[in-house]
């Protein structure tokens, strides 16, 4: 099925007015995106307080209309609907409603991270190069959750875990994956030698995907997943958090408190230019061992002071 997509950029404080006008003209759905996404100005919006409506400074609204909608007629109607709204930058395009899971599976291929770690779509064969070695193979179907290995932040964390596994740091230990998404990092840690893992995410779809992927990999009894408010309070020898920099800063005390003395912590989801603020916040608790960058994204890793 096809739709006519109408996109317009506006100030966050005006978003509701634009959305109301689009809906009054028959919009089937309206989505909001950060106009500064994937830039140093990107700002995560998480769990606003009661009564708060927190939006980005500049918002892109995308509305879907029936494909047969007259674009020029719609534009004329929008421009005359409410004084003070600027529709000069509006864009129209036809989009096709696809089976996104199938599209993703068709495009997703096995990937290797570091020496031993392989991420393999659940419906594909294990690569030949993994068969003759002590490979850590994770069978994955991310579903609606983040984490397939294709994003640089995930890859940075997987290579870090692979190194810890090679150095024997994971052997027999426990791992906390904060912001677990599909469970990819927790599962990789288990395959690399960790005895037990805990995944935490504020998205119930992520917890479901993590459980299903744990079953798919035969480690369901060694992985527990929780919403943040329900997660057990304890310390772990290894903690990895692949979320946005603003959230890493906001949760610095909590995340650092989850790391056992002498334990390892990796922080990712940090855009170039944001790392100084993250380093400043965690310097209270950590001795920083290094930073690694890929495609403008950065991972910071350190050791918890005793």
Swiss-Prot record:
Keywords: Cytoplasm, Methyltransferase, S-adenosyl-L-methionine, Transferase. Its EC number is 2.1.1.-. S-adenosyl-L-methionine binds at residues 154, 179, 201, 242. GO terms for biological process: methylation. GO terms for molecular function: protein-lysine N-methyltransferase activity. Belongs to the methyltransferase superfamily. PrmA family. This is Ribosomal protein L11 methyltransferase. It comes from Xylella fastidiosa (strain 9a5c).
